[in-house]
């Protein structure tokens, strides 16, 4: 009924939020690693 429909919507939006947050975290990690690699390549310390 109405309750299960509401629950599904809530779960879906919760999952999307988790995925977005996880994606952001992973993206930031990748960015930091990329910056570190570029930095050491510029300095020639790789």
From Swiss-Prot:
GO terms for biological process: defense response to Gram-negative bacterium; defense response to Gram-positive bacterium; histamine secretion by mast cell; positive regulation of mast cell degranulation. Keywords: Amphibian defense peptide, Antibiotic, Antimicrobial, Disulfide bond, Inflammatory response, Mast cell degranulation, Secreted. It is found in: Secreted. Expressed by the skin glands. Its main location: secreted. It comes from the Eukaryota. Disulfide bonds join 40-46. The keyword Transferase does not apply. GO terms for cellular component: extracellular region. Belongs to the frog skin active peptide (FSAP) family. Esculentin subfamily. Mast cell degranulating peptide. Causes histamine release from rat peritoneal mast cells in vitro. Has antibacterial activity against the Gram-negative bacterium E.coli K12 and Gram-positive bacterium M.luteus NCT C2665. This is Esculentin-1SEa. The lineage of its organism: Eukaryota, Metazoa, Chordata, Craniata, Vertebrata.
